[in-house]
């Protein structure tokens, strides 16, 4: 059975056909986001996918460092397995997300 994050990835890919996605399977560079997106305007951006049951979002120190170092064109997309559904955070808000949760 696929992990919740894998299911989230497949769902995102299905509902955003206008975005060209590259799934980054990177074990060599810790903290690198899960996805590289390319939109119709020719802009690249990264997305870290997270699935959570509670208010807190589990982010590694490497993921936090990546978003602090790359605050623009980077995002964290969080799927809450409950009534809050999906929220998108800019990479520049990483410390707020860590401190306050959803």
Cite the ranges covered by each PLM segment.
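Charged phosphate-binding loop/patch that engages nucleotide di/tri-phosphates or the phosphate backbone
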Residues: 99-102
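Mg2+/Mn2+-dependent nuclease catalytic core
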Residues: 53-71
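Structural signal for conserved beta-strand scaffold positions within catalytic alpha/beta enzyme cores
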Residues: 23, 48, 76-78
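Nucleic-acid nuclease catalytic cores
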Residues: 68-96
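Conserved catalytic cores of phosphodiester-cleaving nucleases, focusing on short active-site segments
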Residues: 35-37, 43-53
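Acidic-basic catalytic patches of nuclease active cores, encompassing PD-(D/E)XK
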Residues: 1-26, 40
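Short strand-connecting beta-turns/loops that link adjacent beta-strands
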Residues: 40-42, 81-82
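Beta-rich catalytic cores
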Residues: 31
């Amino acid at each position: 059975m696929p992990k919740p994050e894998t299911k989230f990835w497949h769902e995102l890919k299905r509902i955003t056909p206008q975005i060209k996605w590259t799934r980054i399977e990177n074990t060599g560079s810790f903290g690198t986001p899960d996805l590289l997106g390319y939109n119709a305007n020719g802009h690249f951006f990264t997305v870290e996918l997270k699935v959570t049951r509670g208010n807190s979002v589990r982010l590694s120190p490497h993921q936090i460092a990546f978003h602090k170092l790359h605050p623009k064109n980077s995002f964290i997309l969080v799927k809450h397995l409950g009534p809050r559904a999906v929220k998108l955070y800019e990479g520049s808000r990483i410390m707020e997300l860590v401190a306050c949760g959803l």
